[in-house]
Amino acid sequence: MKPYLVKLIICMAIIANSTYAQIPVLNVNNKNSAEVYLQSLDIQVEVTGNVALTKFTMTFKNRTSKVLEGELLFPLPNGVTASHYALDINGKMREAVPVEKAKATQVFEEIVHRRVDPGLLERVEGNNFRTRIYPIPAHGTRTISIGYEEELPIEGNSLCYNLPMDYKEAIENFSLKATVLQGSVKPQTDKANELVFDKAGTNYTAAFSRKNYKPERSVTFSLPIQKEIPMVSMQSASGSYYFVASCFPEKKVRTKQWSNHIGIIWDASLSGLKRDTKKDLEVIQQIVTETKDLTVSLYLLNNKFTKSGTYKITNGNWDDLKKALESVIYDGGTNYSAVRTATLPDKEFLLFSDGLSTLSNADFFPKDQKVMWPRVRQNDSNKSIHCIVSAAVADYSALKLIAAQTNGKFINLNSLSATQLKEELTTETLHFLGVEKTDNIKEVYPSVATPVRNNFSIAGITDVPQTQLVLLFGYGNKVEKRVLVSLNANQANREGNIHRIWAQKKINELDMAYEQNKEELTELGKQFGIVTRNTSLIVLETIEDYIQYDIVPPFELQDEYYRRMKERSAQQVQTRTSLLNNAIAEANVLQEWWNRDIKKQKSKYPVPDSENEHRQQEVPEILDVVEYQEEMREISSDELADMAFADVAFEEEIIPMAMTKMVSEPSQPQIRITPLKQDSEYMKSLKGKADEDYAVYLRLREEYINTPTFYFDMADWFYKLNDKEKALRILTSIAELEVENASLFRLLGYRLKEYNEYELEIYICNKVIQWRPMEPQSYRDYALALYDSGRQQEALDTLYSVLTQSYATNIESKSCGIEEVVVTELNRILNKNTKLKSSGIEKQLIAPMPVDIRVVINWNMDNTDIDLHVTDPNNETCFYGYRETKIGGRISRDITRGYGPEQFMLKKAIKGKYEVFVNYFGDSQVKASGPSTIMLEIFTKYSDKEEKREVVCVQLSKEQKATQNGLLKVAEFEF
């Protein structure tokens, strides 16, 4: 057999056993839809030295007569990040530019609502990249391009390129071209491969195109090398040089001695369904085969951390353990903070997970025990945690950090062949330990201890064109091998984006300690055009958009951009402003209202009996629909007041709500949450017996697995059955449904507040801040969660920051009205906690304003208009069109484009029944969304020692949303 064929077979065998397809998935209306399909795919591969640039250009066709928005999820391998993004604008591809992630999100969403063409590529949880595309025209197409650089691994004596493909549907137009620049040896492919390389000048190229083609086989080729000689690529940059060096250090075989008492931490959260558990079990099989006799403790991790059992394995028989693992039920969110390995008896641990801790930071170690990266010990227990990942979507950085902090192994089953896996599990791992200090070399990455499996590569910056670098390798902390690398800019490969490979390596290292390195990660992403957690790539349609938002456009637009930037007036610049001045004005209005003496007024002249009868009519108890049109927004308040409740209709379609809660003391006002019947089809199968109903839930979940409403309703069912454990497990599954979905997390946070799970609510609200830092509602929700958990000072400071932070003018505009609500809540905290530090708070805002009744709502969907209505015992209704009642009731401003909040307050309540309604008025969302979730808080004796609160979450039905009218009665209470 020819030598190159041996090398290629080795490469192909490894690829066949180690890869998963990186198939982009397009979602429309939050789900994979046949409405839009991949019409054409062009793939361009360019290899320079040991670095490959891969670009996907995808054209999507809209089959419908509707304009749609799509979200494309693009998973990338461990250590690889997107560095190219382009979108078709007026028939021509336009390159994206890097922007801070929060700003990019805000700009994208604002422009989308003007119905023009922005594009956005952002990194979401794990190593996943999401691009948002709008519009996809009716019966039309949109084209996007995404690219990334990666270093090629060495297998045998060859560099191996592999692009996994497993497309399920045929593509109308498919093409692929691969180019090896300055190639000295012809790339090798197997006979079944459709790529055939030919010489083209100093390069080698291969290309093919097909019609109605279904790409099912990986694209692979190999480049023979001399691995004894380090490969070096260099790129000049402002008098310095970026370099990437790759070598193949010789390894000694050292047998790994596994402990005879191992703990298995098995991620049993909902996302566990996406892991390749067959591969996970193969890992355990390998260890058992080598160790034969051991004791295994099995721990299950989802929203809780529980011990499932202890298994004594003798002579390699682990049938009972295997059966237990194969029967695990995957449900709930993932809470890494619940794991405390130091208190467990096991000597070392195997963690099988995707690294996506949806309910806590991805860290097993409490703050008082945490050690700084890169030192590897959590404490003196010397318990290694080996992190094993088999999921295609994973947070590699989180798992690498846990392994590094505990001197454990990080094992990515998606990148290891069976042979490599066996070697990894049965031998000690060689580590790169650093470099010998050299004066003219700096910024070398990795700079920390790094496992070495085959080849190892390092990147850095040198101030001279020619120097030497010594790499240190060993086992544990002992240096046992030195590798000399010669850097010579005249001899090294000088093509390719070496600077981006360097930046990518630095980003990967800094990302492991993300919280400490946020600012530097942002700077790196912006300078090198790389998508990070803090930076995105954005495409705008017009030069005016780049000017308005102060974003430097791609090269072809920069001359006009800079010329016009000099000419623009101050009015053209998008400004930022705080809410403080508005809050002071609202505080004055509130104080004037609160100080007003409201007396019961009697009509001067007799009132006709027919009018009295009309006023005394009760609003129907379940669901009321007020028949008014959108034009009524423009009618005067007096006219609206006369028309309110003039026509009443009934609607049967309703959605289940939270459990009724009653105030215990008879002397206090009684708040009754209106019980709504369970009309969802899946609820009809439940019988009221928790264990049996849980089995029904699991069976039904197969059909509704990606439907948030299903978990929302099911959780409440079990909560009503007083099975809070199952309720929380089901509820927290919502966090696993979609990466970085703030609307889902807001929904989850509302329900957690209702269930008094305040610590978990704090984490959920804090994640929303990370994703939506541009919105005041994010900080308000977080502040109120802090207060509920007893952290009053932190809550006060955070709530005040809602008013003092600066916001873009469009955000400030659609949040107008939140100031009054925040002022009310600030004064409540101060009134009930007199020892808090408040010297930094504007004095004009402070005025105790206790009231007998306060009702407040907010909702989870942006660009949505939901209204609060409160009817008093006199049958007088306070709502946006009739903001003050005769007995002193007052409602805040109508928020029509945000998340709320809206509040009703009554200083002195009269005796009688009060009824609370909500009305879905409409939305301006570009893409269809699930039902809006409303959180309603009802207070009696607000800001008083006798204060009582009830919380209820309500989901509006699709039918009610579609009609854009109707009142839903959610509560009533006697005062």
Residue ranges and their predicted role:
Residues 353-405, 411, 422-424:
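VWA/integrin I-like adhesion module and closely mimicked acidic/polar interface patches used
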Residues 829-975:
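Intrinsic-disorder/low-complexity signal
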Residues 296-324, 342, 359-365, 396-402:
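Short beta-strand-loop
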Residues 257-312, 339-353, 387-390, 394:
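Von Willebrand factor
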Residues 20-49:
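N-terminal, polar/Ser/Thr-rich
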Residues 673-676, 704-711, 724, 738-745, ...:
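Generic helix N-cap/helix-start motif at coil->alpha-helix transitions
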Residues 84-90, 95-124, 128, 132-137, ...:
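An acidic, Ser/Thr-enriched
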